[in-house]
């Protein structure tokens, strides 16, 4: 048995690893290559970003641009690809829609730009996935509300020259700040609204007793004065209503509006009182009708942005308010019924009927608790507690929604006002720029350039130059003046804070640069003045005249206190060799290009020079590696020489 196992075991192992086939029949053929052909792979170039996909992927939606034959208009024969000059970031979402069948909205994209891209590719926004559709609709609604006022203002401003008299009047009523007359009428109507409301309140106040009569209110005691005030207010309100009705774009819509109804209700009691007789039967109805005069206070909504925002909030929260009213109605009916049957057995109970129990339920659910109706039984007290707790929950749930809507609308109005103010300021600046001449613009430009230069330098010489010459000419001359000094001479500046070495070259080559840096460090200075030393461009000895260009000439500045040996050593450390440079004329310089005719200089622009400036900035001894080994500096005195310190070398090349 063991011998038989040993005989076939190697063959089984060999077959397992593929050395010997186990089956005698041949293996079936491999499946045919079902991959897509190479010509079905298309390239979509969107603003330089290349996307590759299969043609059948795009043909899934033939009603769109990429799925129809219209995309052939965008085919480039040279590159063999479809080119679209569109946003590549949004196209990524579009291409994923063709691949997966689900359209998503990226939150970082502008909603208007996203809609434009979808409209270009022929994709409906309604097919956005459920995961992104709510976010898309919210962003779209917020954007529409934010831009509504801006579009209205733009349309009004664009059509201002062609406005008729009625349109101008309506625009003045809706936006009083368009003209002075509209603003005056706006404040006059606001004043009379306040007077009317105060009159309606004060006329009910008792004004004392008259001998032989009972106490009378002020409205009856001073009836003539109050009648005149009421007449004046009603006349103003009537004129305003008639003018608004005349100027309204749609009179039918204006009459149906809420503010129009408030205006009619506010002035109607006065005219009804004029035509009514002194009949006692109708006097009660007239008194009831006078109550509607209090609606004049709602006319303040035209003069208060906060009241308008509150009205918009209540209008936008109509569904939440309807839910609140429905919930309260259900709870009131349920708890009023329960309280009636719970207190029915008590003899001193005030819950005589279910409608009578409504009052207790409303007061309890709104957490007022007047105490005029109180349950006496144990069951009534328990149900009263449950009624109070349920009222808190029912009322508190819709309140955050209302508050959030109010905050949203308020901030939108704030941003709209800010945008209108910014746009008004921009239009004013553009108007000034258009009305101003080109010379005025150039003059302001020159002033701006000179102010920037004076802020950087702040030297008296430049200020004097700006006063005597043209601003741009002065700056250009100053630039060429500095360039001439740099290209014409090789300076060794003994400034304690700044050392500059320049040389003029045409054909140059660099030599031992490390040796130059080492020697330049050894030749730095250590005396630090209390004030900032002037630069080459602002030195008194250099700004008044233009120096001639000489090759490899060294000038020692007045504030130098280096010994002659050190000056000689720094002269020998030039990193640039001049090969075959011509000596320019001593009377010609680049700065003479902008000099006046009386300077007597002729321009010479035949040669071009390359300038290399080596700027050495000294560093304190404590910051240098060998600062610790050097002796401390002696106290300064009249005959004391301060040793030099190590410096950092910065090379600057300029044309």
Swiss-Prot record:
InterPro entries: BTB/POZ_dom, Ion_trans_dom, K_chnl_volt-dep_Kv, K_chnl_volt-dep_Kv4, K_chnl_volt-dep_Kv4.3, K_chnl_volt-dep_Kv4_C, Shal-type_N, SKP1/BTB/POZ_sf. The chain crosses the membrane at residues 183-204, 224-246, 254-277, 284-306, 319-343, 378-400. Regulated through phosphorylation at Ser-569 by CaMK2D. Residues 472-487 are annotated as: Mediates dendritic targeting. K(+) binds at residues 367-370. SMART domains: BTB (SM00225). GO terms for biological process: cardiac muscle cell action potential involved in contraction; cell communication involved in cardiac conduction; chemical synaptic transmission; establishment of localization in cell; membrane repolarization; muscle contraction; potassium ion export across plasma membrane; protein homooligomerization. It catalyses: K(+)(in) = K(+)(out). Residues 523-565, 615-655 are annotated as: Disordered. The modification Phosphothreonine is found at residue 459. The keyword Transmembrane applies. Residues 637-655 have a biased composition (Polar residues). It comes from the Eukaryota. GO terms for molecular function: A-type (transient outward) potassium channel activity; metal ion binding; voltage-gated potassium channel activity involved in cardiac muscle cell action potential repolarization; voltage-gated potassium channel activity involved in ventricular cardiac muscle cell action potential repolarization. Zn(2+) binds at residues 104, 110, 131-132. The modification Phosphoserine is found at residues 153, 569, 585. One of its GO terms (cellular component) is voltage-gated potassium channel complex. Residues 1-182, 247-253, 307-318, 401-655 are cytoplasmic. PANTHER family: POTASSIUM VOLTAGE-GATED CHANNEL SUBFAMILY D MEMBER 3, VOLTAGE-GATED POTASSIUM CHANNEL. Belongs to the potassium channel family. D (Shal) (TC 1.A.1.2) subfamily. Kv4.3/KCND3 sub-subfamily. Two N-terminal domains regulate binding to and modulation by KCNIP1. This is A-type voltage-gated potassium channel KCND3. It comes from Mus musculus (Mouse).
